[in-house]
Amino acid sequence: LGLAQTELLIRTEKLEAKLVTALAASEPDNVKAQLDCADLEVISGDLDAAFNRLIECVRRFAGADRTAAKDHLLALFQLVDPADPRLKVARTSLASALF
């Protein structure tokens, strides 16, 4: 968990939550905004929102953007206790979105 947490903190330390959230809402196809917003949702403790946001990106995006959303989601999964039921639901949803 240590490395994944450190990476998350580094990614979010200079983000302004209100600006990122507004950008993600106004530009749903902006993959960077969606990834940043998901990071902030994790930091604030809203795992469900972060997971759902990125799973929706995997469903909607194609190519490199889809891969970026999937990889980012998998990195966020590393922050969560494997026994957490939200993780199981998110993994199942991701599998469904991928296939």
PLM feature spans:
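Alpha-helical adaptor scaffolds
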Residues: 1-35, 39
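Structural register within alpha-helical repeat arrays
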Residues: 2-5, 37, 57, 73, ...
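Structural motif corresponding to the intra-repeat A-B loop/turn of tetratricopeptide repeats
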Residues: 12-13, 44, 80
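Alpha-helical junction/boundary sensor with strong preference for TPR arrays
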Residues: 26-27, 61, 80, 98
